[in-house]
């Protein structure tokens, strides 16, 4: 199984509100767009590499927002993936909309796909149903942002909550399976994988984030 949370390329010198204070949305050079053509080339390249790595019965989860998810979804289907679900992660307490000119952004999207339409993928339907009070698990998930414990060794500007990763991993993999994260960040995917008896492999170019992930995984 692959879980990918790629750069959204949203570091555009704008501002947001965090804990009642104005903060820059810039996260680093790794999140700055080099133009639509370059972004498209970047997304397609790693999606093709992941496609080659993915086992015939494996699945991939890819995160995004409306800024990039439509492009990613198009490219995934061009590469050959078959999309299974469009998961909506709802944030219960999102940053306020400072412009007051459109609805408050309160969700992110996760595309879940298998290698091709005929592939027999893993999905623990009964487990997910049991976790949802005996009802079918829907594709809208509500999770709060990472808590303080998850940031003990430091934080990542786009860190996903551990509970979100746990649901993805538990629903679509088995004990002993290898989970790969091509954009490891703070290592949350690895923490969730190891916690539930899976193996883990991750990549991270930013040295500070690599060291953060290493500390979390060694714990």
Regions found by a protein language model. Give the residues of each.
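Short, conserved SAM-binding/catalytic segment
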Residues: 214-219
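Core catalytic lobe of class I
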Residues: 1-211
């Amino acid at each position: 199984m692959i879980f990918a949370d790629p750069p959204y390329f949203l570091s555009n010198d704008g501002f947001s509100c965090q804990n009642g204070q104005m903060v820059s949305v810039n996260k680093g050079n790794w999140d700055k767009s080099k133009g639509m053509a370059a972004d498209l080339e970047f997304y397609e390249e790693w999606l093709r590499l992941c496609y080659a790595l993915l086992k015939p019965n494996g699945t991939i989860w890819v995160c995004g927002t409306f800024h990039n998810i439509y492009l990613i979804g198009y490219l995934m289907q061009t590469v050959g993936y078959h999309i299974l679900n469009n998961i909506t992660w709802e944030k219960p307490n999102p940053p306020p909309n400072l412009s007051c000119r459109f609805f408050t952004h309160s969700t992110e999207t996760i595309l879940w796909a298998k290698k091709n339409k005929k592939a027999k993928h893993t999905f623990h339907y009964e487990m997910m149903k049991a976790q949802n009070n005996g009802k079918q698990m829907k594709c809208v998930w509500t999770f709060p942002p990472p808590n303080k414990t998850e940031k003990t060794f430091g934080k990542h500007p786009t860190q996903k909550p551990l509970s979100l990763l746990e649901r993805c991993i538990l629903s679509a993999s088995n004990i002993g399976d290898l989970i790969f994260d091509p954009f490891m960040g703070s290592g949350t995917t690895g923490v969730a994988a190891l916690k539930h008896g899976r193996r883990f492999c991750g990549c991270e170019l930013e040295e500070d984030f690599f060291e953060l992930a290493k500390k979390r995984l060694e714990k």
